[in-house]
């Protein structure tokens, strides 16, 4: 479980919450496929749950199945991907708190290796 970080975030719209989940999922998927070939992944599921109350709670769950002959520590890879996603989302939220939502999305795309 990640720690609570207070950044003075305003109430977010439903679209912004969906975007945060999308950013987190994209970062995780990109990170996994930076380390594994698509042919090495039998199944993958990435779930983002967001709850906005007094705080914004983001819960990420990742499941990756690889064939037995693929020599990779899947749990470590998943942990690293989730950490990366939280870092990118935190930077994006800090930009939103400062009123720079578009720059935060661009930074998230750059950090995940994607660009428009």
From Swiss-Prot:
- Where does the signal peptide begin and end? none
UniProt protein name: Uncharacterized protein PH0533
| Family of this protein | Belongs to the UPF0440 family.
Superkingdom of the source species: Archaea
According to the record, the residues making up region (Disordered) are 97-116
Q: Give the Basic and acidic residues compositional bias ranges.
A: 100-116
């Amino acid at each position: 479980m990640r720690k609570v970080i207070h950044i003075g975030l305003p109430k977010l719209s439903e679209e912004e919450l969906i975007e945060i989940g999308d950013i987190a999922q994209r970062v995780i998927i990109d990170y996994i496929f930076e380390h594994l070939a698509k042919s090495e992944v039998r199944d993958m599921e990435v779930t983002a749950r967001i709850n906005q109350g007094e705080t914004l709670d983001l819960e990420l769950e990742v499941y990756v199945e690889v064939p037995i002959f693929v020599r990779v520590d899947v749990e470590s890879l998943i942990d690293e991907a989730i950490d990366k996603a939280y870092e990118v989302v935190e930077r994006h939220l800090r930009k939103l708190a400062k009123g720079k939502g578009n720059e935060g999305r661009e930074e998230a795309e750059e950090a995940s290796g994607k660009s428009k």
